[in-house]
Structures are given as C-alpha cells and as structure tokens.
C-alpha cells in the first residue's frame, strides 16, 4: 500500500508466487491486476521449472490470487495488457522480434477464468503485413484471426504467433506497452 499524500510505503506483501519473468501486465476495470509472463520456459529446460510458463495470471487488489494461469489467453512471450471497460475484451502485446497483437474475447466479461477466444490482429487486404515497413499515419481496416490452440503442448516462443501469422495476422517487432482510452487500444513497439 502506498500513501500518495506522504509518499511513503505503508505496507508491502507478496500477492502471487510461482510465476516466472513477469513483465508489465496491466489493470482491469474490475479492480485486479493481470500479470504477464515474458517467457515460455517449462519443465525439461535448464531452469528446473515444475510447470510450464508463458501465461497471464489475475491478481485481485484485495484478497488472495489463485495462481491459476489463464491458459485460454495464450502461452507466449507476453508484455502488457489493457482492457476495454465496456466489453471486458483484453488486448495483449507480445515482446519478441516476430510478435502479434492479440485480443481475448472473454466468455463472460469480468470473469477471465470462464474462458474465451484468443485472436490476432490482421490488416484487411494485407495478409501477413510486416509493420516494420508500414507507412505511418494511414488508417487501415483490420480484422481478427482466431487462434485455435492458445496453449500448445510443446510451446516455443513462436507457437501462438505462427498460428495467427499463418492465418494472415500482422507481424510487429517487439510490442511493449498498451493502453485503452475512449474506444481505442493503443500500442507501442520497440522496433516496428
């Protein structure tokens, strides 16, 4: 807990354990935090992990987290998320050289554990668009490509991206932050 008036930390405690390489994540309109793992490491690697990683976890502002990965939101190199406060749709960035911009359509707004559909952004009429060479300042229609297997058994860093890209999804390079304002999700990319 942080006291904004005094600038002092009042209380500090762990809210989640058992995750790996957590990155930006983001807040939800219903008062929780989505923390994102920026790795797909798992058992059998050189890190001695018991469980696979590369997921999003929800951490309530008050109370205990379940430490259950939200597997239908995808297993990939996550960076950040933002949430549309009206629909509950979650937008997700991926931080690697060949990266996708994803959205998760929850089966039930505000209850991500109820499952849903993961999709990857595609530019209409420009399948497999490489945004590193795109023209700036041009509005382009988009659509979304379904990800049929958001939690592949032997996941690599590119497993989910390859599915979306194969369906015509766009390639970004190292997506970082994302924010939802008004009716739009904004994203920033490190290298295109």
Question: What feature does the model see in each segment?
Answer:
Residues 1-192:
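Sequence/structural signature of beta-propeller domains
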